[in-house]
Amino acid sequence: MTTFATEMVPPADNAEGSRPVAGQPRAFSPGELAFLIGVPLLSAILLLFHPGGEGDEIYLDARDNVTRFLVVHIGMMVFIPLMAVVVYLLLRGVEGTAASVGRIALVPFVVFYSAWEVLQGIGVGILVNELNGLPQAEPALREDLVQDFAEHVLIGPFGVFGSIGSMGLIVAAIAAGVALYRHAGAPVAVPVLLAISGLLITVHPPPYGPTGLALFIVTVLLYVRSQSRNRATAPLGQPRSA
């Protein structure tokens, strides 16, 4: 009876672009929802304090903001794994290839993006602080040392660690969006916004990072709302999640 009723439901998009599915993932508890929203929100607030600059004069940008520079990047060491947990939780109960790809992609994101943050953020901050304590050092020498370190092939803007870590997050975001749309009845806005947010978050200084995290929060709310609506309108005979 369940199979027959499920097959009778056409796999067409509804008015909001979401697709009916045979079963819905378990609803998030209030605590889980607070975690899904709170982590990106606090991360966005932290990134608002990220020192500015174009990246071509890193010593000059950071020399008077060393404490803030270090606090932001040490904080990011906490939020990187927490964001991975957020995406993993968002995919709870969702099956399919896209969901598996999204979960696997979180591993290189956490490993390599964290390594990049340690060196590019904390390492640069410590180096700038030490150079500030050497008044005999020529200003040009300080600038060159910091710039050369920050542009090293492993940790530069398009270096090995940052590139692999960023690609991990982007792939995880895109795959998660596809999985939620195809297998969890999410509206089409969810994969679109997740892809955009992943791209913006990897360019983490403001306004990009905070904007991407804000879009991520909007995506979570859209998905949760669609899940509530899908459960409320599920036809008789279609299995509901407990």
Regions found by a protein language model. Give the residues of each.
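Cleavable N-terminal export/targeting peptides
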Residues: 1-2, 11
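Hydrophobic, aromatic-enriched alpha-helical segments typical of multi-pass transmembrane helices
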Residues: 3-5, 17-241
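N-terminal intrinsically disordered, low-complexity tails
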Residues: 9-15
